[in-house]
C-alpha cells in the first residue's frame, strides 16, 4: 500500500460479540489483528444495522445465520461494497442446525446469490461451497490461525472496546427507539378515546400489579411465562451446567490417575445434533486403542469440553482413568501446558471432514505431539504428527522422546509458515485485492418490473399465486421481505424462495423498512397489507417511497375483517385508518365495505376476488394426532383484543365441553401464527381433555403448520370471526363461527354458535349426512356472496402493469 493510498477498512459482521466463540476468534479477530499489522483497519459488529456499512471498503460476514445478514449483504452490494462470507462449517451436512431458529443453509444460499466471494478454512469445505452455491462464485481458502495467549488477550480486548462504545450510546437514542413509546404514539393516532383509555389502563395494570404482588408477598397474576424450550436456540437447549471450580479435577469413574500419569488431552465442542458423529463421540470410536494404552501405560485421559453429562455417559465408563474440565480458552491453555500428547480424532463424516487443522497446529506450536485421524486438512503436517492407528501413534510418542522432539522441531516451522499471523494476513490481502480490483464482480442485481412486499407470515399465501402469474406471463418479479418476518417465522424464508422469484431481505428500523433505491426497471410495487398502523409500517414505508419515485403502488384486502376496509373498533377506528397505496384490491363487491369507510379509501378500491389459492398443499400433521379418527379444527383470531372476557370464556369452555362430549373426535385448537393469544398471552389455567390438542406454533412439531395446510385433514371448522371461515368455506368444509353475543351479519349464511347448545349441535351435524350437506351449501353461498369469482391474481397483475384497465380488470 502506497503512502498516498487510503488505508482499507474492513467491517466484520459477527454472530455475537463474544470472544469465547471459536469462529469469532479464528475467523474474525485473529485475521483482523493480522491485517492491522499490514495497515488494514477494521471494525467489528454483531448488529445488522445498515449504519455499520458507513466508511468500510469490504464487508465480511463470519458464520452468522440471520435474516439481518441477508439484508446487510444486499445493502452492501447496493452501495458497491464487496461482500465476503466466511464459513467454517459445512452447513449443508445432514441435520446441521437442527433446532436452530432459521436453517443456516437457507441463509447461506440467499447470501450466496449476491456475495462477491466466499472464504473457508479448508479445501474440502471450499469444494462443498462451490457445489452448493451459484456457478462462478469465487471461493477462497484462508486457513485458521494459531491461538496464543497474547493473541487471545488482544482478541478479547477488541471485543471489549466494541462493547464499551455501545454502552456509551446516548440516552435520547434509547428513548427514541423505545417500543413502548412507539406503540403509545401509534395508539394516539388510530384509537378512539375509549380504546386509548382501555389500553392505558391495561398497560398500567401489567406494570403495577407485579409490584403490588411483591409488596403483598404473593405470586403476580401477570408474571411473565417462561420461554418454551422449543423457542430457545439449540446452544441453550443443549448446554450442560458449568462445573464449579472445585469440581474441575474430579475423576469420574475408573481408578484415579496416579500423580505421574502421562496426560492424553482432548479438547473441543462436545458435539451437535446434526447427522454424523462429532465431538466426544470421536473418542469412543477409538475406545479399543485408548483402553489398550491404559493397560500398558500409566496414563490419564483429560477431556476439556462443554458437556459434563455427556462426558459421564460416554467417556467415564471407558477403562482408562479420565478427568473432565469445563471448557474455556484459559483452561484449554492450562491443560495444554500439562499435556504429554494431544488427541485429534475425526469421524470423517460430511461435516467433520471439512474441519481445519487449528487444534493440531495449536498443540504442535505449544510443543506437544499430536495423534490424529488423517484428514485432508492435516496433509501438510503429515510428516510431523502420527496420523492413523491411535494405539501405534500414542505408543510411539510415549516410548520415543527423540521422535517427539524431531516432530515438534519440524512442526513449529511448518505451522508458522502455514498458519502464522503473517500467513493469515497474506491470504486475506489476496482475497481483498481480488474483490476490490474488480477481478470479481458482485452478482448482477435483479431488475424486476414488479416488486411484491412480504412482512407477515400470512403474506406468503398471497404472494405465491402472484409470483406464479407474473412468471407465466414473462414479467420479471422480485420479493422484498422484512427481517422481522423471517426471524419470527423462519420457515417463510424457504417458502418465499421456493416461489422462484428473486428474494431480497430488507433491514428495518423503528419507523419502517430501510428502503433501497428502486431499480429503474420497477413499474409497480404491491404490498399485502399497507396502512398507517404499526404492524404495517414496514410495507407502508416502501409504499411511500415508491409513491415518491412515481411508481404504481397497490395493496390488498388481506383479511375478511380488514381494518380500514371492512372492520372498525375502538383501537382501530376506521375513519383514522389510512392507505398510502394508490390502489386497493378487494375480494368482493364494494357494497361489502364498512359503511363508515372513507370516501378517499373507497375510491381506491377495485374488486378483483381473493388471490389466495383455495386449494392448498396438505400439511403433515404431527404423530400426536391419532390416525383414523375424524379431526375438527378450532381456530383463534389474530385480534383477540376485539373480544371481552365473557366471549373468551365462552370460546374456551365451549371447545373443552365439545371435546368431552365427542371423545372419538380429535379437536385441534390452532392459534393464529401471529397472534398466539392462547399460547403466549392467556394468563389463566388450562385443563384440556386428551382429545383437545393445541397446535402451539412455538413447538417444533407444530412449527410451520398453517391453517391452510390443516384444512385438507378436517371434517369441519369452528372459528372465531376471522378469515379462516372464508378459507374453509372455499374448500367446501362446513363452518361455524363462534358469535356468542356478537352481531355477525357479515358471516351469513354460515352457522353461528351463539349458545352452549350450538357447539354440540354443529359437531353432531358434521357427521349426519343431511345436516352436513346443509352446512356445505351454506359455505358455498357464503363464498358466492363475499368473493368475486375468477382469477384474482391475474387481475391484480394486469391492473398494476396496465394503467388502461377499468375497475373490473377488462381492457377499457
Where do the protein language model's features map onto the residues?
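C-terminal "capping" alpha-helix adjacent to the active site of nucleotide-linked donor transferases
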Residues: 154-155, 386-406, 412, 754-774
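Nucleotide-sugar-dependent
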Residues: 274-281, 329, 340-365, 372-381
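Conserved catalytic-core segment of nucleotide-activated headgroup transferases in glycan assembly
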Residues: 11-38, 147-316, 320-337, 459-463, ...
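Active-site donor-binding acidic/aromatic loop of nucleotide-activated sugar
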Residues: 319-329, 335, 506, 690-703
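A charged, aromatic-enriched C-terminal amphipathic alpha-helix characteristic of glycosyltransferases
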Residues: 401-437, 773-799
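A short, active-site helix/loop in glycosyltransferases that binds the activated sugar's phosphate group
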Residues: 112-139, 146-159, 167-172, 221-243, ...
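Active-site and donor-binding regions of nucleotide-sugar-utilizing enzymes
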Residues: 91-94, 99-107, 451-615
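A donor-sugar binding/catalytic signature common to diverse glycosyltransferases
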Residues: 341, 348-368, 596, 702-748
